[in-house]
A protein has these predicted regions:
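Non-catalytic signal-transmission and effector/linker regions of two-component phosphorelay proteins
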Residues: 1-28, 43-44, 72, 110-152, ...
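Alpha4 helix (beta4-alpha4-beta5 surface) of REC/receiver domains from two-component response regulators
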Residues: 20, 58-72, 79-106, 208-209, ...
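Conserved phosphotransfer microenvironments
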Residues: 34-39, 48-76, 85-87, 194-221, ...
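Receiver (REC) domain switch/output surface
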Residues: 104-136, 238, 248-268, 272, ...
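Conserved nucleotide-binding and Mg2+-coordinating catalytic segments in signaling enzymes
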Residues: 276-296, 317
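Conserved helix-loop-beta segment at the catalytic/binding core of cyclic-nucleotide signaling proteins
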Residues: 281, 332-365, 374, 378-383
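Active-site-proximal structural segments of metal-dependent nucleotidyl cyclase/transferase enzymes
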Residues: 295-322
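Catalytic-core segments of nucleotide cyclases and related cyclic-nucleotide turnover enzymes
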Residues: 362-370, 397-421
Length: 421
């Protein structure tokens, strides 16, 4: 990842070692400034990133607030902020990605590169939005609000700190818990995870095995990982956002928030890019087809199946009781991981999920649909109904001779539901 472009280094004392390392990594130009001039430097330079070189609090709280506001409200591509910190201290700016000052400078550069990859992706999305608007005369519906609202953090642990960690994390993030590394691995494959906390209760060998799984999968290259206890140093190069932390839950949450927000923002950008590349066919919130596109695709599939005498089945997944917005989104995103390549689906207006199985008869569709419903039931989170079991029901219909799009939809919306096991 290229680091070219102006970057501001904020420090009241010379930060020669860090500046030299940045220069060697390809950062140019580097603008050094003191805290008193940081706001003016940000406005004048319009940097690609801001680096807080000195650990500890900002010397002036008002300056820190103003600089934070300037960075957060800057138009165009995001400006990552990375701050050196001591131990489990919080960063000088609340929006800054923390980097332990006691670690080698190479670790700092790796975290900077990770953040700059997100900035580059954001720039690509903004360009595609402009192109989309020029050619189509409209903008697709794009997600808004804090990306942290989309985030899910996985806590793996079974020691005495696990309950406190769960409470602290649950107050700030959507959270998944795992009492074993095997369960944690299942969650990673089934859900969109934006941060991982490896808690106490695991042997060093188990922790190393789990981190090895993360390091070998490019999907988890930039995911924030907080390891309570000693983190093996071998993973620093492949996992730039791995940290060793102590067991204080509140400090851990404060350290994780900026990193998790950045990762969730990256995931949002990837969904938006998919939407733009397909001219608005996919919903950037769920990753499934939009409702209108699903209707068009199903209409074509019905006509094609009728002409070629091939099978076509349709499933509707509904849930007992009202779903909150987060649970509805989680179930839809989970479906994107379970759907077969030749099938397609969407989220309906009431939160139910529609899934079309092409070239699949009723018997085969029944097997696949029940498996999907069972996985949704097991993995979906409903924070407002934490004590209730989520019952996912499946309604199935298959194409018959003389069927049309409307008749098939009427049957799947009104036929008898089969409760998922």
């Amino acid at each position: 990842m290229s680091l070219q472009g102006p970057m501001i280094v904020v420090a009241d004392s010379p930060a020669a070692e860090l500046v030299d390392a940045l220069s060697a990594a390809g950062v140019f130009p580097i603008v050094e400034t003191k805290w008193t001039d940081a706001v003016a430097a940000f406005v004048a330079v319009k940097p690609t990133a801001v680096i807080i070189a000195e650990p500890g609090d900002a010397p002036d709280e008002a300056t820190a607030r103003t600089l934070t506001r300037q960075i957060a409200t800057a138009s165009g591509t995001i400006v990552p902020v990375i701050a050196r910190v001591h131990g489990n201290q919080e960063a000088a700016l609340p929006i800054a990605l923390p980097a332990d000052a006691g670690l080698p400078v190479a670790r700092f550069i790796a975290r900077l590169r990770s953040a700059m990859r997100v900035r580059a992706l954001h720039a690509t999305v903004l360009r595609r939005i402009e192109t989309f608007a020029v050619h189509d005369g409209r903008l697709p519906p794009l997600p808004a609000g804090d990306a942290l609202d989309d985030a899910t953090v996985l806590i793996a642990g079974r020691g005495p700190l696990y309950p406190k960690l769960s409470v602290a994390m649950g107050e700030r993030f959507n959270m998944l818990g795992a009492l074993s590394v095997e369960t944690a691995a299942k969650h990673l494959n089934a859900r969109d995870i934006d941060g991982i906390v490896v808690g106490d209760g695991f042997s060093p060998r188990m922790v190393e095995a789990f981190l090895t799984v993360l390091a070998q999968d490019t999907r988890f290259r930039d995911i924030p990982v907080a390891v309570i206890g000693d983190a093996p140093p071998d993973f620093a190069e492949v996992l730039p956002n791995i940290d060793h932390v102590d067991g204080d839950p509140l400090r851990l949450v404060a350290r994780m928030v900026p990193l998790v927000r950045m990762h969730a923002f990256e995931a949002r950008l990837k969904r938006m890019l998919k939407t733009l590349d397909t001219k608005g066919m996919f919903d950037p919130v769920t990753g499934l087809l939009t409702r209108d596109t699903f209707g068009q695709e199903l209409d074509k599939a019905v006509a094609e199946a009728g002409d070629r005498s091939t099978a076509l089945s349709l499933a509707r997944f509904s849930f007992d009781g009202p779903l909150d917005a987060r649970a509805s989104m989680d179930s839809a995103r989970l479906l994107t991981r379970l759907i077969r390549n030749n099938d397609f689906g969407c989220r309906d207006g009431d939160g139910a999920l529609l899934l079309a199985f092409t070239q699949t008869d009723l018997r085969a569709a029944h097997v696949v649909a029940r498996r999907i419903a069972g996985l949704i039931k097991n993995f979906m989170l409903i924070p407002q109904r934490a004590g209730d079991k989520v019952a996912a029901s499946v309604t199935l219909a298959t194409l018959k001779s003389g069927d049309t799009f409307d008749s098939l939809m009427r049957r799947v919306m009104g036929s008898q539901a089969v409760a998922a096991e």
